[in-house]
From Swiss-Prot:
EC category: hydrolase
Protein name: Superkiller complex protein 2
Pfam families according to UniProt: DEAD, DSHCT, Helicase_C, MTR4-like_stalk, MTR4_beta-barrel, Ski2_N
Chain positions of motif DEVH box: 423-426
Result, substituting M765I: In a colorectal cancer sample; somatic mutation
Subunit composition and interactions: Component of the SKI complex which consists of SKIC2, SKIC3 and SKIC8. Interacts with HBS1L isoform 2.
Chain sites annotated for binding ATP: A332, H333, T334, S335, A336, G337, K338, T339
One GO CC term on file: Ski complex
Species for this entry: Homo sapiens (Human)
Localization terms from the record: Nucleus; Cytoplasm
Protein's job: Helicase component of the SKI complex, a multiprotein complex that assists the RNA-degrading exosome during the mRNA decay and quality-control pathways. The SKI complex catalyzes mRNA extraction from 80S ribosomal complexes in the 3'-5' direction and channels mRNA to the cytosolic exosome for degradation. SKI-mediated extraction of mRNA from stalled ribosomes allow binding of the Pelota-HBS1L complex and subsequent ribosome disassembly by ABCE1 for ribosome recycling. In the nucleus, the SKI complex associates with transcriptionally active genes in a manner dependent on PAF1 complex (PAF1C).
PANTHER family: ATP-DEPENDENT RNA AND DNA HELICASE, ATP-DEPENDENT RNA HELICASE SUPV3L1, MITOCHONDRIAL-RELATED
Taxonomy, superkingdom: Eukaryota
């Protein structure tokens, strides 16, 4: 075709091409161009150079011509070695611990060795990262003290643990396995496997052995010699024996390998039986502290420790139980000598060559106890957040948080632990840190005995019972009855030298309350106020006076105490600012002698010499030195730690005569005073002002009275304004102290630490908490009741539900649901404001309780008690009111028909109508009618009360009573199915959706009940009773199962919500396995989610160490405030980024259902000390930091110390995640923070 043909031309001759030579500037180079009209020359110096394209250059160098790279040199090129085939390497196994050992068999009498036998060793394959057993090998020496977040904790005491011993000592039934058909052909997790189907092969010769025959006579369980001999006895020729075995003794094949494993597990894995409980499961054993111990030295001829004094009775009883290795709970008054019990436990551990841990709630108390115990025992160590002294000692002193960390991290110190001493146990009531005590008590292993030291608490037996059930051991409770030094309580109303004698006894040393003293104080105050009003006019009294009034009050009080030789005195003031003001206002007061001044001066110089020069010139140091020289001291959280220790030591020496302190001084070592003064009986608890609780008052007042020096202690309450009410004083001074209450709450650290251990569950931790104790202490009774109900249910006869009774189960369930729905609606009505308003005098109601069944009544009077409202109601009844429960109304409706369920079917008297007056609770009223009667409630009640007396019993009722009864009877006869009632939605204006939906559901159920067919059967009553009995038993069984299950836990919904938060953020997977982020969070001491997110978001790695420290101060600072505008832009951006991450976490928490709002979560961050920490990390002296913030020096020090602990946690977390750069920065940040006065060594450790 012509369209497809192409013209083929010959190639052009190169000589015919129009080539032109172009000179390239002045370079001497030429270029041939095949372009018509090309120029004869270019620029004078050629084209300007241009940057080559990087991508083209890289491709040219590395891809197009890579030969120039030294990588491709022959000497560096990759070589391949031929693998040598070694089939025998498949038989090699890795080195493993020897699972057996040789044990000598000796003659029982002579001890002569008769032979050796091989015994299996236990726990040879355990490690700290796979087992919770105490028999696992110790971890690395570097981790023996603190443990490691990747290690497992030791098994908590009191929990059921299936041990290896149980598996080895059981009588294992010999199970024979068919090695031809019972083996798996598809490995777990694979879709395909090996095909072992029989093939067409010639039948093997009779003399060949099968695998089953070869393995049958092997003694895999290590049987005795007789069995081995029996197996090996020749029964004939060798060939005959072997060939006859498979035929004469065929293998008994199991139906399934899974069944076999389950059968073995059911017979083998059995939780160990709990120790035999005491009678009636009495775990808390009260000990009579007044019963003398006459044979003390006969029972303990060589005590582990002796004192220079004779121990008290309660101390001897506690020591006797310690010798028996019992756990004790000593609840004694302040300064009664609880430390004696701790000292004996420490001495006993040293005698046994074991270890003791002494825990305290605060670090300052740990330092003080370290000094005291070191002076007594010598071999004592101290572990706090920033100090580690003698960790190898037999007695270690630490805070409870550190012990919790050691327990979770599997520290090997726990192995040698014999005693754990919990001091100040009443601190468990602390909202923030009380949960730590419960965690530690739950996680302690079984071999550790517990010593609890506490002030007197009313529920010591209950708390001990919880610990006893928790650990399955008896706890002996020893309480003191009286104080060693009785107290006298006074009211002081003076305010000048003329009135310094106005001291009125209110509560004497025998505990008698003197109303005379109270009224005398009131009269003295009134008289002075009237004179003041006559001179200066009336003035409203106040609780707190001004500085001038305070100065007059304290000068007059201290003058009176000094005259009576009642110094030293501790003045408890519930404000840091008022402490400083009151001490500073006493400029004219000097209470020390010249020799005491010299001693104070030398002590101050010696203690302050360890500080740098500028730190010794701090305003607080100079001011405190001046106060101490005059015998005054101040002690609160705003004081520098070294100054607080100086004040404490001088006070213990008697050189501080007057100490103004907050209530934290009442917690700690025994530092009693002659007198204790309360500046006020009201305090601010963080949310509101309130009176002191009895426990708080007793704890602080207990510092009065020095044992062995004072016959009585003096407690004085200042009345600067009006005298407090007598009832308030009586409740505060003589009321019962606060009970020990659970503050258990879920934290992400707790959840992650338990989730990483398969054998421990968070639900078990919640079950064993003190908050669940009231509902869990009857678990054994619930189990017994459940077993009895199960047996009873099995003995019941099945109801016949054939024919017309086929819908009997539905009818029963409809009736039950209708009743529950009606009760719910009525409960909502009674809880509403409009519902309670409608229940006024004269309202007609339907009464339904144990005595009355749907009887009409009229409300006569409405009153309120401490819990709910009480309605005094006149109710219709038979005449006379039957006292036999079998004759009452409800019995007639034992088998409910539709008319009984739908509507009320009001009670009508069978004979003459009578009435009674009863007190009803809101739940006793089944309905509120629309009818209101005009009644005179007072007259009716008065007449009814009169007729209850024997001599007026036959008097006729008043006309008001008769009229009310006739109105009720007429209303019941007119509406036998129930009078009109108030509609909860239309009449009472209830907008609750549950009420609206409940009303709709109730009407639907009424229609279903009226259409039921079972009620028409003559067998309905008998079969209904059978079904109801069965359903009631099943319902009770479901209730008991619920109480015994995890679903009844109070914190279970929150636990699921927090796990969902962790799953959303990627800390755990769908199966609950802890991922890398979760393991990093376990290493954090606080703010675990926020710190982990900041680390994984790379928000810290790009910052300098001082900037990281400044940002993290927002997580530990307790002083609210803004960061200010003088910060570098890097810090401002960092603060915004931290808040953004916190907001994201808060939003996830809200999305998962937690109650904490995003604003509350972000509001926990306080960046008020960012600039202070930033400048401190950059090297600014502490003396120059005061101008950057108005925060007290003590709080600044506290913030920096906690910040250094957080930096160490982040350093360990960075190493765990593989971030050496961040770890190095955190190490640098901690080093920058740890300097000068902030980290000055405690005086107690020198």
């Amino acid at each position: 075709m012509m369209e497809t043909e192409r013209l083929v031309l010959p190639p052009p001759d190169p000589l015919d091409l129009p080539l032109r030579a172009v000179e390239l500037g002045c370079t001497g180079h030429w270029e041939l161009l095949n372009l018509p009209g090309a120029p004869e020359s270019s620029l004078p110096h050629g084209l300007p150079p241009c940057a080559p394209d990087l991508q083209q250059e890289a491709e040219q160098l590395f891809l197009s011509s890579p030969a120039w790279l030294p990588l491709h040199g022959v000497e560096h090129s990759a070589r391949k070695w031929q693998r040598k085939t070694d089939p025998w390497s498949l038989l090699a196994v890795l080195g493993a611990p020897v699972p057996s050992d040789l044990q000598a068999q000796r003659h029982p009498t002579t001890g002569q060795i008769l032979g050796y036998k091989e015994v299996l060793l236990e726990n040879t394959n355990l490690s700290a990262t796979t087992s919770l057993s105490l028999r696992r090998p110790p971890g690395p020496a570097s981790q023996s003290l603190w443990g490691n977040p990747t290690q497992y904790p030791f098994w908590p005491g009191g929990m059921d643990e299936p041990t290896i011993t149980d598996l080895n000592t059981r009588e294992e039934a010999e199970e024979e396995i068919d090695f031809e058909k019972d083996l798996l052909t598809i490995p777990p997790g694979f879709k395909k496997g090996m095909d072992f189907a029989p093939k067409d092969c010639p039948t093997p010769a009779p003399g060949l052995l099968s695998l089953s025959c070869m393995l049958e006579p092997l003694d895999l369980g290590g049987g005795d010699e007789d069995e081995n001999e029996a197996v090996g006895q020749p029964g004939g020729p060798r060939g005959d024996t072997v060939s006859a075995s498979p035929c004469s003794a065929p293998l008994a094949r199991a139906s399934s390998l899974e069944d076999l494993v389950l059968k073995e597990a059911s017979t083998a894995v059995s939780t160990p039986e709990a120790p035999e409980p005491p009678s009636q499961e009495q775990w808390a054993i009260p000990v009579d502290a007044t019963s003398p111990v006459g044979d003390f030295y006969r029972l303990i001829p060589q005590p582990a420790f002796q004192w220079a004094f004779e121990p008290d009775v309660f101390q001897k009883q506690a020591i006797l139980h310690l010798e028996r290795h019992d756990s004790v709970f000593v609840a004694a008054h302040t300064s009664a000598g609880k430390t004696v019990v701790a000292e004996y436990a420490i001495a006993l551990a040293q005698k046994h060559m074991t270890r003791t841990i002494y825990t305290s709630p605060i670090k300052a108390l740990s330092n003080q106890k370290f000094r005291d115990f070191r002076n007594t025992f010598g071999d004592v160590g101290l572990l706090t957040g920033d100090v580690q002294l003698h960790p190898e000692a037999s007695c270690l002193i630490m805070t409870t948080e550190i012990l919790r960390s050691m327990l979770y991290s599997g520290s090997d110190v726990i192995r040698d632990l014999e005693w754990v001493i919990f001091d100040e146990v009443h601190y468990i009531n602390d909202v923030e840190r009380g949960v730590v005590w419960e965690e530690v008590l739950i996680m302690l292993p079984d071999h550790v005995s517990i010593i609890l030291l506490s002030a007197t608490v009313p529920n010591a037996l209950e708390f001990a019972d919880w610990i006893g059930r928790l650990k399955r051991r008896q706890i002996y409770v020893i309480s003191t009855v009286t104080r060693p030094v009785p107290l006298e309580h006074y009211l002081f109303t003076g305010n000048s030298s003329k009135t310094q004698g106005e001291l009125f006894l209110l509560l004497d040393s025998r505990g008698a309350f003197h109303t005379k003293g109270y009224y005398a104080a009131v009269e003295a105050k009134k008289e002075r106020m009237s004179k003041h009003a006559q001179t200066f006019g009336a003035k409203q009294p106040t609780h707190q006076g001004g500085p001038a009034q305070d100065r007059g009050v304290y000068l007059s009080l201290l003058a009176s105490l000094r005259t009576r030789a009642q110094l030293p005195v501790v003045v408890f003031t519930f404000s840091r600012g008022r402490c400083d003001e009151q001490a500073s206002g006493l400029t004219s007061l000097d209470l020390t002698t010249s020799s005491e001044k010299s001693e104070i001066h030398l002590f101050l110089q010696r203690c302050l010499a360890r500080l740098r020069g500028s730190d010794r010139q701090l305003p607080q140091v100079l001011h405190m030195s001046e106060l101490l020289n005059r015998g005054l001291g101040v002690h609160h959280s705003g004081i520098l730690p070294i100054l607080k220790e100086i004040v404490e030591m001088l006070f213990s020496r008697g050189l501080v005569k007057v100490l103004f302190a907050t209530e934290t001084f009442a917690m700690g070592v025994n530092m009693p005073a002659r007198t204790v003064v309360f500046d006020s009986m009201r305090k601010h608890d963080g949310s509101t002002f309130r009176d002191l609780l009895p426990g708080e008052y007793v704890q602080m007042a207990g510092r009065a009275g020095r044992r062995g020096l004072d016959p009585t202690g003096t407690v004085i309450l200042l009345c600067k304004g009006r005298v407090p009410e007598m009832a308030d004083l009586h409740r505060m001074m003589m009321g019962k102290p606060s009970q020990l209450q659970s503050q258990f709450r879920l934290t992400y650290t707790m959840i992650l630490n338990l989730l990483r251990v398969d054998a421990l569950r968070v639900e078990d931790m919640m079950k064993r908490s003190f908050s669940e104790f009231p509902s869990r202490k009857d678990s054994k009774a619930h189990e017994q009741a459940l077993a009895e109900l199960t047996k009873r249910l099995g003995a019941l006869e099945e109801p016949d539900m054939t024919g017309q009774l086929v819908d009997l189960p539905e009818y029963y369930s409809w009736g039950e649901e209708l009743t529950e729905t009606q009760h719910m609606i009525q409960r909502r009505i009674m809880e509403s404001v409009n519902g309670l308003k409608s229940l006024s005098a004269g309202r007609v109601v339907v009464v339904k309780n144990q005595e009355h069944h749907n009887a009409l009544g009229v409300i006569l009077q409405v009153s309120s008690n401490s819990t709910s409202r009480v309605f005094t109601t006149l109710v219709l009844c038979d005449k006379p009111l039957s006292q036999d429960p079998q004759d009452r109304g409800p019995a007639t409706a034992e088998v409910p028909y539709p008319d009984d369920l739908v509507g009320f079917k009001l009670f009508l008297p069978e004979g003459p109508c009578d009435h009674t007056v009863v007190k009803l609770q809101p739940g006793d009223m089944a309905a509120i009618t629309t009818k209101v009667l005009r009644v005179n409630g007072e007259k009716i009640l008065e007449d009814f009360s009169k007729r209850q007396q024997p001599k007026f019993k036959k008097d006729p009722p008043l006309a008001a009573v008769t009229t009310a009864v006739q109105e009720l009877l007429r209303l019941a006869q007119a509406h036998p199915a129930g009078p009109p009632t108030l509609d909860p939605v239309n009449d009472l204006q209830l907008k609750d959706m549950s009420v609206v939906e409940g009303g709709l559901r109730a009407r639907k159920l009424e229609e279903l009940i009226q259409g039921a067919q079972c009620v028409h059967s003559p067998r309905f009553p008998a079969q209904y009773l059978k079904l109801r009995e069965r359903m009631q038993i099943q319902k009770e069984m479901e209730r008991l199962r619920f109480l015994l299950s995890d679903q009844s836990l109070l914190l279970l919904p929150e636990y699921h919500q927090r796990v969902e938060v962790l799953r959303t953020l990627g800390y755990v997977d769908e199966a609950g396995t802890v991922k890398l982020a979760g393991r990093v969070a376990c290493a954090m001491s606080s703010h675990e989610l926020l710190l982990t997110e900041l680390m994984f978001d790379n928000a810290l790695s790009t910052l300098r160490p001082e900037e990281i420290a400044a940002l993290l101060s927002g997580l530990v600072c307790q002083s609210p405030g803004d960061a200010g505008d003088q910060l570098p832009n890097t810090l401002k951006q960092g603060i915004e980024r931290v808040r953004a991450v916190a907001k994201r976490i808060g939003e996830v928490q809200v999305a998962c259902g937690l109650n904490q709002t995003v604003e509350e979560f972000v509001g926990e961050l306080n960046f008020g000390l960012v600039e202070v920490v930033y400048e401190w990390a950059r090297g600014m002296p502490f003396s120059e930091l005061a101008g950057l913030s108005g925060t007290p020096e003590g709080l600044v020090v506290r913030c920096i110390q906690r910040l250094a602990e957080m930096c160490r946690s982040l350093r360990g977390a960075a190493r765990l995640v593989g971030e050496p750069v961040l770890g190095a920065k955190m190490e640098t940040a901690a080093t920058l923070l740890r300097r000068d006065i902030v980290f000055a060594a405690s005086l107690y450790t020198q």
